[in-house]
Amino acid sequence: MDVETLLSDVRAEELWGAIVSAGEREALLRETLPFNELLTLTFSAKESLFKALYPQVRCYFDFLDARMVAVDTQRQTFVLALLKTLTPNCPAGRRFSGHFWREGDDVTTFIFC
């Protein structure tokens, strides 16, 4: 689980390269929500993934080692895919589903593994 405060438009433009790849950014820009909201959601989702997996895999991985592959704003769900093999049970390509909600300026995400 993770909670993040909504990034401003300016901050999102400054930070996106550390959170998402150029291709992932382009995909987020095609979504209906504003980019800063989607980047905050992606940041929080990737933090949730790290918090869920690190106790199992015991190896460091960063934001660019996972990719947001789906966001459903109606159902408030998302899917992340690993781009790096972490362990035999967590190979590249493995997908993780999660949920999110927004309350005021806070975005909360969680993933069950």
Indicate residue ranges for each PLM-predicted region.
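Core catalytic alpha/beta fold that binds nucleotide/phospho-ligands
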Residues: 1-113
